[in-house]
């Protein structure tokens, strides 16, 4: 399979803000994981997916009330039982990401034990190959 980009957009409302009047990091993290889960669930049954680690969730600028938080996610690495998803957030028509990072999910059976998923990733774009290299170096 080739990486496929999934889009997940959210309107930043007053209840999403922190004491500085910008998007609360906790809300950002929640949406970040949801965006990653959507990509993972495109390849595996949702009931079999568990999040095991968020890697390097990095913010580069604040997000203001009324802005549209546009998340993009895609599977960028597969292991025997795991898959790693790259997620980035861009604010409406901004080119540079406001937030980016990786999430590792594991495929589990009905007892919650890791089980092989059989997924194989085919990387063709320069960006995907670069992101895959970064994902290989995650702890």
Residue positions per predicted region:
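A eukaryote-biased signal for short, well-structured alpha-helical docking elements
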Residues: 33-34
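HotDog/MaoC-like acyl-thioester-processing domains
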Residues: 64-65, 76-139
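Catalytic strand-loop segment that frames the active site of acyl-thioester-processing enzymes
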Residues: 1-25, 129-139
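Hydrophobic beta-strand-centered segment that forms part of the acyl-chain substrate-binding groove
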Residues: 3, 23, 37-72, 76-83, ...
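Generic preference for hydrophobic/aromatic residues in regular secondary structure cores
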Residues: 12, 49-51, 119-121
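Generic structural detector for well-ordered beta-strands
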Residues: 9-13, 58, 104
